[in-house]
């Protein structure tokens, strides 16, 4: 079974579209875990209503909104995941109908996998939001729209996955076995700021563990719903500094993760 973890924060309309896209998946042996970095009542009601609307398992994990704690609730979802493999997506990315299937066919022990996403433009995003039923954008529709990185939306199922030595994951679209997540102790909860760090951190720790990284470009396709970019150079700088310190330490297993540890385990290169 696959555990699909969705990181969400307040965007209820986007989650509704994501759940519709999940309901269109060709591969059905999965569960959905919604990791909410907050406790929005409207979000809770949508998820509660979704239990009777969809024929897949939906679990909801949340905590009080006191700032950026996405990593903490993400670890809670990992802890409770029942699948042998875990896929991570963000709460503003709808999925191609064969998204989960392509991950399922590719994933294996000793490796982790990632994809990219189409950046939907404001007009096409509004069109999707305004429709009561999701119609997944076709490649032609993407070409004729105001979207960017459209080439990422071309589905090429016969394309071979490629090992990527110098290409890191994006936190919005990647997957790995739960066992490997436990071996590195999940996400490092020392990352308490947005913009930079937590996904790159777990990426290098999985490589340090000995895993190989593979691209599933043009196979595990996402469509990112438009919203204004929120970025802070100062916050990014602080996250980058912490990330560099962690890499200099060189430990695959973080202390402040799923478990709270006092002794680090170092793995040989």
Predicted regions mapped to residue ranges:
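C-terminal catalytic/acceptor-binding lobe
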Residues: 190-269
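Short aromatic/hydrophobic "clamp" motif used to bind/position activated sugar donors
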Residues: 86
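Short beta-strand/loop segment that forms part of the nucleotide-sugar
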Residues: 29-39, 59-63
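Glycine-rich, basic loop-to-helix element that forms the pyrophosphate-binding segment
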Residues: 64-81
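Short, flexible, basic/aromatic active-site loop/helix in glycosyltransferases
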Residues: 133-166
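A conserved acidic beta->alpha catalytic loop
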Residues: 36-46, 93
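Short, acidic, metal-binding catalytic loop of nucleotide-sugar glycosyltransferases
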Residues: 20-29
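Conserved donor NDP-sugar-binding/catalytic core segment of glycosyltransferases
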Residues: 98-139
């Amino acid at each position: 079974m696959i555990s699909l973890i969705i990181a969400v924060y307040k965007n209820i309309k986007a989650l509704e579209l994501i759940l519709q896209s999940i309901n269109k998946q060709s591969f059905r042996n999965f569960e959905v875990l919604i990791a909410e970095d907050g406790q929005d009542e409207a979000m809770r009601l949508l998820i509660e209503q979704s239990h009777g609307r969809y024929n897949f398992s939906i679990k909801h994990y949340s905590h009080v909104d006191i700032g950026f704690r996405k990593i903490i609730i993400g670890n809670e979802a990992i802890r409770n995941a029942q699948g042998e493999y875990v896929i991570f997506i963000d709460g503003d990315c709808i999925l191609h109908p064969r998204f989960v299937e392509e991950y399922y066919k590719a994933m294996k022990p000793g490796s982790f996998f990632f994809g990219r996403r189409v950046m939907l433009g404001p007009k096409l995003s509004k069109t999707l939001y305004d429709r009561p039923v999701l119609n997944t954008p076709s490649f032609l529709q993407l070409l004729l729209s105001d979207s960017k990185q459209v080439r990422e939306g071309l589905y090429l199922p016969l394309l071979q996955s490629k090992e990527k030595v110098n290409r890191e994951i994006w936190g919005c679209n990647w997957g790995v076995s739960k066992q490997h997540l436990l071996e590195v102790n999940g996400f490092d909860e020392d990352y308490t700021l947005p913009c930079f760090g937590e996904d790159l951190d777990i990426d290098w720790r999985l490589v340090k563990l000995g895993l190989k990284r593979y691209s599933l470009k043009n196979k595990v396709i996402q469509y990112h719903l438009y919203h204004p970019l929120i970025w802070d150079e100062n916050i990014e700088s602080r996250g980058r500094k912490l990330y560099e310190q962690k890499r200099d330490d060189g430990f695959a297993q973080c202390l402040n993760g799923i478990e709270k540890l006092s002794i680090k385990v170092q793995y040989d290169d």
